Design a protein with these regions (language model features):
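Amphipathic alpha-helical polymerization modules
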Residues: 1-92, 169-176
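Bacterial flagellar/type III secretion structural subunits and associated motility module proteins
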Residues: 2-21, 28, 90-176
Length: 176
Protein backbone atom coordinates (compact mmCIF):
# COMPACT_ATOMS: atom_id res chain seq x y z
CA UNK A 1 0.00 0.00 0.00
CA UNK A 2 1.29 3.46 -0.74
CA UNK A 3 1.49 6.31 1.74
CA UNK A 4 -1.51 8.16 0.24
CA UNK A 5 -3.76 5.15 0.79
CA UNK A 6 -2.47 4.79 4.34
CA UNK A 7 -3.27 8.44 5.02
CA UNK A 8 -6.74 8.06 3.49
CA UNK A 9 -7.54 5.00 5.62
CA UNK A 10 -6.15 6.62 8.76
CA UNK A 11 -8.33 9.69 8.18
CA UNK A 12 -11.36 7.45 7.66
CA UNK A 13 -10.63 5.52 10.86
CA UNK A 14 -10.13 8.74 12.82
CA UNK A 15 -13.45 10.08 11.51
CA UNK A 16 -15.20 6.82 12.47
CA UNK A 17 -13.69 6.92 15.95
CA UNK A 18 -14.69 10.56 16.47
CA UNK A 19 -18.22 9.89 15.20
CA UNK A 20 -18.60 6.76 17.36
CA UNK A 21 -17.37 8.57 20.47
CA UNK A 22 -19.77 11.46 19.79
CA UNK A 23 -22.63 9.00 19.27
CA UNK A 24 -21.80 7.17 22.50
CA UNK A 25 -21.50 10.42 24.48
CA UNK A 26 -24.91 11.55 23.23
CA UNK A 27 -26.30 8.09 24.02
CA UNK A 28 -24.84 8.25 27.52
CA UNK A 29 -26.54 11.60 28.17
CA UNK A 30 -29.85 10.32 26.82
CA UNK A 31 -29.68 7.17 28.95
CA UNK A 32 -28.95 9.31 32.02
CA UNK A 33 -32.07 11.31 31.18
CA UNK A 34 -34.11 8.09 30.76
CA UNK A 35 -32.96 6.98 34.22
CA UNK A 36 -33.83 10.35 35.73
CA UNK A 37 -37.29 10.36 34.13
CA UNK A 38 -38.01 6.81 35.32
CA UNK A 39 -36.96 7.92 38.82
CA UNK A 40 -39.34 10.89 38.63
CA UNK A 41 -42.15 8.60 37.44
CA UNK A 42 -41.44 6.31 40.40
CA UNK A 43 -41.61 9.30 42.78
CA UNK A 44 -45.00 10.26 41.33
CA UNK A 45 -46.26 6.71 41.82
CA UNK A 46 -45.12 6.78 45.45
CA UNK A 47 -46.91 10.10 45.99
CA UNK A 48 -50.13 8.62 44.64
CA UNK A 49 -49.72 5.59 46.87
CA UNK A 50 -49.76 7.56 50.10
CA UNK A 51 -53.45 8.39 49.59
CA UNK A 52 -53.44 11.91 51.05
CA UNK A 53 -54.09 13.88 47.87
CA UNK A 54 -57.32 15.60 46.86
CA UNK A 55 -58.98 14.90 43.51
CA UNK A 56 -57.51 18.12 42.05
CA UNK A 57 -54.05 17.19 43.29
CA UNK A 58 -54.45 13.73 41.73
CA UNK A 59 -55.36 15.35 38.42
CA UNK A 60 -52.24 17.49 38.68
CA UNK A 61 -50.12 14.40 39.41
CA UNK A 62 -51.72 12.66 36.42
CA UNK A 63 -50.83 15.59 34.16
CA UNK A 64 -47.30 15.56 35.56
CA UNK A 65 -47.02 11.81 34.89
CA UNK A 66 -48.21 12.24 31.31
CA UNK A 67 -45.65 15.02 30.74
CA UNK A 68 -42.88 12.78 32.07
CA UNK A 69 -44.02 9.97 29.76
CA UNK A 70 -43.90 12.34 26.77
CA UNK A 71 -40.45 13.54 27.87
CA UNK A 72 -39.38 9.90 28.03
CA UNK A 73 -40.53 9.44 24.42
CA UNK A 74 -38.65 12.59 23.38
CA UNK A 75 -35.51 11.23 25.03
CA UNK A 76 -35.91 7.83 23.37
CA UNK A 77 -36.21 9.73 20.08
CA UNK A 78 -32.91 11.57 20.68
CA UNK A 79 -30.67 12.19 17.70
CA UNK A 80 -26.99 12.63 16.97
CA UNK A 81 -26.07 14.28 13.70
CA UNK A 82 -29.69 14.02 12.54
CA UNK A 83 -29.84 10.25 13.13
CA UNK A 84 -31.99 8.58 15.77
CA UNK A 85 -29.86 7.01 18.49
CA UNK A 86 -32.12 4.18 19.59
CA UNK A 87 -33.66 2.86 16.34
CA UNK A 88 -31.13 0.08 15.89
CA UNK A 89 -30.01 0.29 12.28
CA UNK A 90 -33.15 2.32 11.39
CA UNK A 91 -31.58 5.70 12.10
CA UNK A 92 -33.78 7.83 9.83
CA UNK A 93 -37.10 7.38 11.67
CA UNK A 94 -38.10 8.05 15.28
CA UNK A 95 -38.35 4.72 17.14
CA UNK A 96 -41.17 5.83 19.48
CA UNK A 97 -44.57 7.31 18.67
CA UNK A 98 -46.62 9.21 21.27
CA UNK A 99 -50.40 8.85 21.16
CA UNK A 100 -52.42 11.29 23.27
CA UNK A 101 -55.84 9.71 23.70
CA UNK A 102 -59.07 11.71 24.13
CA UNK A 103 -59.55 10.16 27.59
CA UNK A 104 -56.37 11.88 28.80
CA UNK A 105 -54.06 8.88 28.70
CA UNK A 106 -50.74 8.90 26.90
CA UNK A 107 -49.59 5.81 25.06
CA UNK A 108 -46.12 5.09 23.71
CA UNK A 109 -45.64 2.67 20.84
CA UNK A 110 -42.76 1.41 18.78
CA UNK A 111 -43.06 3.35 15.51
CA UNK A 112 -44.00 1.59 12.28
CA UNK A 113 -42.88 2.20 8.73
CA UNK A 114 -45.25 2.64 5.76
CA UNK A 115 -45.54 -1.17 5.48
CA UNK A 116 -46.54 -1.56 9.12
CA UNK A 117 -43.18 -3.01 10.17
CA UNK A 118 -41.77 -1.98 13.53
CA UNK A 119 -39.03 0.60 12.97
CA UNK A 120 -36.74 0.07 15.90
CA UNK A 121 -34.73 -3.08 15.57
CA UNK A 122 -31.85 -4.55 17.48
CA UNK A 123 -29.40 -4.44 14.58
CA UNK A 124 -26.08 -2.93 15.57
CA UNK A 125 -24.38 0.02 13.95
CA UNK A 126 -20.75 -0.78 13.23
CA UNK A 127 -17.71 1.35 12.48
CA UNK A 128 -14.30 0.34 11.17
CA UNK A 129 -11.74 1.85 13.53
CA UNK A 130 -8.64 0.11 12.19
CA UNK A 131 -7.75 -2.45 9.58
CA UNK A 132 -9.88 -5.51 10.37
CA UNK A 133 -11.28 -4.01 13.58
CA UNK A 134 -14.84 -2.77 13.87
CA UNK A 135 -17.01 -1.84 16.83
CA UNK A 136 -20.71 -1.79 17.60
CA UNK A 137 -21.65 1.61 18.96
CA UNK A 138 -25.39 1.71 19.52
CA UNK A 139 -28.19 0.34 21.66
CA UNK A 140 -31.78 0.05 20.48
CA UNK A 141 -34.93 1.19 22.23
CA UNK A 142 -36.00 -2.45 22.37
CA UNK A 143 -32.86 -3.32 24.31
CA UNK A 144 -33.59 -0.46 26.71
CA UNK A 145 -37.29 -1.22 27.23
CA UNK A 146 -37.32 -5.03 27.21
CA UNK A 147 -35.84 -6.10 30.52
CA UNK A 148 -35.74 -9.36 32.47
CA UNK A 149 -37.60 -9.69 35.75
CA UNK A 150 -36.34 -11.73 38.72
CA UNK A 151 -37.64 -14.93 37.11
CA UNK A 152 -35.92 -14.31 33.78
CA UNK A 153 -39.14 -13.32 32.00
CA UNK A 154 -39.02 -10.43 29.54
CA UNK A 155 -40.96 -7.37 30.68
CA UNK A 156 -41.74 -4.63 28.17
CA UNK A 157 -41.44 -1.32 30.02
CA UNK A 158 -43.45 0.36 27.26
CA UNK A 159 -46.48 -1.73 28.27
CA UNK A 160 -45.88 -0.94 31.93
CA UNK A 161 -45.62 2.80 31.24
CA UNK A 162 -48.83 2.70 29.19
CA UNK A 163 -50.56 0.83 32.03
CA UNK A 164 -49.36 3.52 34.46
CA UNK A 165 -50.86 6.25 32.31
CA UNK A 166 -54.21 4.44 32.27
CA UNK A 167 -54.12 3.75 36.01
CA UNK A 168 -53.16 7.34 36.85
CA UNK A 169 -55.94 8.62 34.62
CA UNK A 170 -58.45 6.31 36.33
CA UNK A 171 -57.32 7.43 39.79
CA UNK A 172 -57.38 11.12 38.81
CA UNK A 173 -60.94 10.70 37.53
CA UNK A 174 -62.06 8.80 40.64
CA UNK A 175 -62.42 5.47 38.82
CA UNK A 176 -60.12 3.53 41.19
Amino acid sequence: MNINNEIKYTEKYNYNIDESVGWMNTTDGALDNVGNLLGEIKETILKVGNGTYSQNEMKSLNEDMNEKIKQLADTLNSTHGGKYLFGGSSVDDAPITVIENPDGTVKLEFSKDKNGQTIPNTDDLKADISSGINIDYNISVGEILNIKDGNGNTVNLLDEINNLSTLMNDIANGDE
